[in-house]
Amino acid sequence: MTEMQPAILALLAITAALGLLVLAVVTTTAFVKVSVVLFLVRNALGTQTIPPNIVLYAAALILTMFVSAPVAEQTYDRITDPRLRYQSLDDWAEAAKAGSQPLLEHLKKFTNEEQRRFFLSSTEKVWPEEMRAGVTADDFAILVPSFLISELKRAFEIGFLLYLPFIVIDLIVTTILMAMGMSMVSPTIIAVPFKLFLFVAIDGWSRLMHGLVLSYTMPGAL
């Protein structure tokens, strides 16, 4: 039993690390906004389970990896700096600080200032005095929730705009069915083909994916 304890502890540590990695991917990258927008579009189309959840999550993950590639590369370059020795806890702390800087800049770039001010001021009411003494608006504890809420807000703004043309189709179809005395026919059955035709005609998936990617354009980029 004693011989197995190190292996069990290592397994627990790896599992915990993977869990934290998943949490970081969801809360500090484009994954939240992209996935929410994709699911809102599916709901607006009225196709319910088409595309399947796994397809939408895969698409969201791929777009997230594409958008986050510069941050990942900068982080890798910093933590593999030959000047970092990794021989003491101070060395590891220095590497963690250097490696987190690109992510910190990414969060600051796409975080709403109002949210940052709210969470910073909330520390005075929620956190004990010793914890809030040195906190700033650029700390991860402030940036991560601010970024998450900012991304959710932008996702629902995009979803609202995407919903409008499909709602118009629903209203038109419902009105026509009522005028024809076909109130027993579900408008959804008739509206979905027209929604799909409109979405395909305007190359909806390409435009949607392109728009989501370009919403993370670097300042000053063409």
Swiss-Prot record:
Example GO biological process term? Answer: protein secretion
Q: Which GO terms describe its cellular component?
A: plasma membrane
Q: How does it sit in the membrane?
A: Multi-pass membrane protein
Please report the name of this protein according to its UniProt entry: Probable translocation protein y4yL
List where the protein spans the membrane: 6-26, 52-72, 158-178, 182-202
UniProt family annotation:
Belongs to the FliP/MopC/SpaP family.
Function statement: Could be involved in the secretion of an unknown factor.
Q: Which UniProt keywords apply?
A: Cell membrane, Membrane, Plasmid, Transmembrane, Transmembrane helix, Transport
Q: Which PANTHER family match?
A: FLAGELLAR BIOSYNTHETIC PROTEIN FLIP (PTHR30587), SURFACE PRESENTATION OF ANTIGENS PROTEIN SPAP (PTHR30587:SF2)
Native species: Sinorhizobium fredii (strain NBRC 101917 / NGR234)
